[in-house]
Amino acid sequence: MPPFVLFPLGLLLRFSRPPQPPHMSIPSLLVDSLPVLAQGAVLTVKFAVLSMVFGLVLAVVLALMGIARNRVLNAIARIYVSLMRGTPLLVQIFVIYYGLPSLGISLDPTPAGVIALSANVAAYMSESMRGAILGIESGQWLASYSLGLSWGQTLRYVIGPQALRIAVPSLSNSLISLIKDTSLVSVITVTELLRSAQEIIASTYQPLPLYLAAAAVYWVLCQVLEWVQRWWERRLALPTRH
């Protein structure tokens, strides 16, 4: 092909853009996107609650290891908490989803995300629970032992209920943070709220209103959880004397 033909053809290819769909009005875009965003929000809540449940179980184990009279258990709990709190959650997600297959352990995106979030939030909740347990006056342990209660019975019937009142605000904050942290699992193709918004953006080429809409949904979810937190704190609060 002659050079005088190649040159304008190259310029045409260089500066041409792929056709884009016509922009919708923002109200129409948000109305059309609402069902998809709502579905993503539901999946986000389910994802966060599931991670919170598994994380709470692990946090209880870590907290008990942290207060046990065993240096090995104490050291294991401290090292775990240090690693989880001292490394970015995004890196932990990558290690579990992209790193474990090199060891022969392959996980689907959803289980990998739940494991990563559960393992991460457990470290923070375990410290909250451990601090709440240690915040109870030591004389209550001695009084319980004098009544014939075992260590487990004392923890369950005497120390645990009081420690729960202390730990509720911190545990609730962990759940609120977990709602926002679920957005990170979108990098491993888990279709939660942020991923749902990104999929709509890919077809509409209107990122700003959709990202703002996703942020608004996250904010609403967190506000609802804050309301539940305050209600729970009032229910667990000790009666005041007048």
Question: Which residue ranges define each predicted feature?
Answer:
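Transmembrane alpha-helices and adjacent helix-loop boundaries
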Residues: 15-242
